[in-house]
């Protein structure tokens, strides 16, 4: 519901007679009536006018972003969206978005806006919700802005699709705790004073650092890395020490991103829409911790559309990877959640990024068959009896395919050859 113009360029001198708490009461009423008529369906409604507590009933967005008289000059408005979205998260409104492309202004020259459009899409892919929207009948489909812009927009959108298992796990955390997915740096690193001056970058969950380019013509980005070791997510074998500012390359096809050493990132295949496939292989990217430490992630899943998640109908799959002097010990924990089960069989895929290539792999003490990448990927969505691994020294990855039976398994990747 749109209660008035709200693009930061003009505000009415007199209010229209509605209070913000009137809006939240309206959204509460709409949610209750929807659920009354659809007792096992989730409601989705969105507003920019509400009151404290709106997260119980609706989602927010930042209002109409004004591009100005010339839409190609909307860089400042795009940059402003990051601190606004972060502020919303701090206000316990974890699910928010902005008008990706900037709402206001006619687009008369699509090629002239291609760079700005690309950066909008790249930044918007890391909104908790992503929504491309422009006023009137102005079309903003990616292919209108030229072949390069379309290609770059497609890559950003597909990246978000791949990250949906990661995002959905953090959506559950937001539901339980109020912690937002899109986080100011200081929320994760409150003791580091430098993080309080980083309003052009943010944490996406606890593992990923995202620094979108928001300046016209920029092909690099000044990024602050807090404590720890950070791996360039666009070049996953390049690592940097933390507690430093650095300038990273950011051509038009690149979103500056870093993953913290000691992280596990679950991913799904790219799809045309989120539930195109009811069950699919989940890939866990593993960036091992330093020797003697371990990496953990607990994947959250539920049916996605009904209210079963409120009744305990969900499951978690805990994954742990310990780094030892002998190699890596991967533990797939027992799947928890008796009230929800997968709608079909699937494989779990693991990709460990390592320069120390294991020579032997054991599953629960028994040697695993070694194969090549092609064989490992073959029929992974239809064949659920194959357990195999593939060390790839050239790519610096150690790959594993494991049928998901919901049980605990210990996989040892050993740096030396052993005979069993």
Regions found by a protein language model. Give the residues of each.
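Surface-exposed beta-strand/loop patches in extracellular or lumenal glycoproteins
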Residues: 217-226, 338-357
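Short conserved micro-motifs at the rims of enzyme active sites and ligand-binding pockets
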Residues: 57-58, 106-110, 131-132, 221-223, ...
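Solvent-exposed beta-strand/loop surfaces of large extracellular or lumenal domains
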Residues: 233-252, 362-397
């Amino acid at each position: 519901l749109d209660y008035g113009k709200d693009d930061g360029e003009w505000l009415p001198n007199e209010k229209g007679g509605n209070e913000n708490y009137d809006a939240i009461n309206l959204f509460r009423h709409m949610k209750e009536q929807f659920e009354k008529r659809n007792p096992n369906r989730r409601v989705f409604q969105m507003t920019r006018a509400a009151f404290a507590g709106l997260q119980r009933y609706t989602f927010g967005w930042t209002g109409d972003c004004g591009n100005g008289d010339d839409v190609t000059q909307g860089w400042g408005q795009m940059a402003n969206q990051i601190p606004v979205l972060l502020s919303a998260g701090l206000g316990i409104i974890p699910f928010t978005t902005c008008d990706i492309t900037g709402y206001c202004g006619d687009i008369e020259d699509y090629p002239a806006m291609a760079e700005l459009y690309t950066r909008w899409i790249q930044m918007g892919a890391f909104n908790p919700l992503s929504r491309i929207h422009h006023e009137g009948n102005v079309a903003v489909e990616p292919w209108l802005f030229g072949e390069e812009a379309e290609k770059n927009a497609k890559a950003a959108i597909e990246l978000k699709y791949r990250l949906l298992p990661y995002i959905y796990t953090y959506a559950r955390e937001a539901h339980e705790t109020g912690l937002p997915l899109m986080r100011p740096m200081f929320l994760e690193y409150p003791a580091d004073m430098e993080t309080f001056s980083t309003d052009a970058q943010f944490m996406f969950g606890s593992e990923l650092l995202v620094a979108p380019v928001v300046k016209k013509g920029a092909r690099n980005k000044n990024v602050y890395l807090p404590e720890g070791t950070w791996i360039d997510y666009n070049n996953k074998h390049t690592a940097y020490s933390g507690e430093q500012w650095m300038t990273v390359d950011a051509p038009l096809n690149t979103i500056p991103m870093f993953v913290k050493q000691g992280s596990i990132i679950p991913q799904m295949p790219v799809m045309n829409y989120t539930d195109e496939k009811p069950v699919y292989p989940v890939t866990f990217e593993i960036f091992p911790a330093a020797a003697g430490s371990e990496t953990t992630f607990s994947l959250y899943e539920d049916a996605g559309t009904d209210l079963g998640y409120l009744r305990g109908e969900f499951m978690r799959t805990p994954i742990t990877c310990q780094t030892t002097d002998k190699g890596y010990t991967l533990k797939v924990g027992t799947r928890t959640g008796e009230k929800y089960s997968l709608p079909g069989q699937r494989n779990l895929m693991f990709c460990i990024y390592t320069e120390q290539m294991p020579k032997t792999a054991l599953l629960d003490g028994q040697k695993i068959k070694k194969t090549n990448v092609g064989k490992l990927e073959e029929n992974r969505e239809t064949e659920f009896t194959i357990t195999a691994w593939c060390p790839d020294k050239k790519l610096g990855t150690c790959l594993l395919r494991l049928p998901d039976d919901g049980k605990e398994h210990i996989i040892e990747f050993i740096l030396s050859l052993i005979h069993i």
